[in-house]
Amino acid sequence: MQSEALRNPRVIVVQKLYSQEFNKESKLTFPKHRYKKFIKDVVLGTLERKELIEETIRQHLSEDLSIKRTEKLLILLLQAAIFELLYRPQTSVNIIINEYLNTSKFFLEQSQKNI
């Protein structure tokens, strides 16, 4: 199950975004993968439109929340999902939401194992 999740393209997208967030100088690489083009498109598209996506998130946060106080992993998940919702209309909204919910479960399970 875990190795299957690690091959999930959206898990890889979030891992790439997380890596880039904390090591901005590192060069992004996209190893051979069945969904390499998808992964690359979502990662690069999310990074290119980061400010616009963050503004979209800010508009929908309640007043007592802020992006800076929200866990970074959650923000990255939201950024990638919002990118797909806005810029990849060929994928159904239901599929995007379901896939990112599953992706968030994977990362939650990983963080609980490390406690």
Q: Where are the language model's segments positioned?
A:
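N-terminal interaction/assembly modules
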Residues: 1-115
